[in-house]
Amino acid sequence: MSEQNNTEMAFQIQRIYTKDVSFEAPNAPHVFQKDWQPEVKLDLDTASSQLADDVYEVVLRVTVTASLGEETAFLCEVQQAGIFSISGIEGTQMAHCLGAYCPNILFPYARECITSLVSRGTFPQLNLAPVNFDALFMNYLQQQAGEGTEEHQDA
């Protein structure tokens, strides 16, 4: 048997923490007097880095912008991070773990933080829908594969 078959996959959460938080209401208090029919924009981004052997930090950045016409009602950004021990996987499996599995763990924490910040800004409750990071990761892989195909066709 090869050594690879003897290595079991291991995953452990070491820590989950808020790395950065920002809340701005640039048009307050005037925005409170307007009819509340906002356009809400959600942006997501993930980043990961290796801290030590089998230890990784994953950061999920969630930015929510609510606008009333041309005016920004509020802008909220949360960077929710986690430190994870991950061993026994490599390549695409590791990329999936860092790019989808860990963000799935972090998102509820980021969502709660954003909901709290929006509430403290005295805006109506904001309920962010769950995010399918697995589907986003698959789309990312398909885009990367498409770009690789285009590069080979241009050559």
Curated annotation (Swiss-Prot):
The UniProt entry, under InterPro entries, shows: SecB, SecB-like_sf
Family per UniProt? Belongs to the SecB family.
What this chain does, per the entry, is described as: One of the proteins required for the normal export of preproteins out of the cell cytoplasm. It is a molecular chaperone that binds to a subset of precursor proteins, maintaining them in a translocation-competent state. It also specifically binds to its receptor SecA.
PANTHER family xrefs: PROTEIN-EXPORT PROTEIN SECB, PTHR36918
Which HAMAP family would you find in this protein's record?
A: SecB
Q: Name one GO biological process term.
A: protein tetramerization
Where would one find the signal peptide in this protein? none
State if Chaperone is listed as a keyword.
yes
Its quaternary structure? Answer: Homotetramer, a dimer of dimers. One homotetramer interacts with 1 SecA dimer.
Which molecular function term from Gene Ontology is one that the record holds?
Answer: unfolded protein binding
Q: Name one GO cellular component term.
A: cytoplasm
- Where is it localised? Cytoplasm
Q: What is its main location?
A: cytoplasm
Q: Which SUPFAM superfamilies match?
A: SecB-like (SSF54611)
According to the entry, what is the taxonomic lineage of the organism? Bacteria, Pseudomonadati, Pseudomonadota, Gammaproteobacteria, Enterobacterales
- What is this protein's record name? Protein-export protein SecB
Question: Which keywords does this Swiss-Prot/TrEMBL entry list?
Answer: Chaperone, Cytoplasm, Protein transport, Translocation, Transport
Supply the Pfam families for this chain: SecB
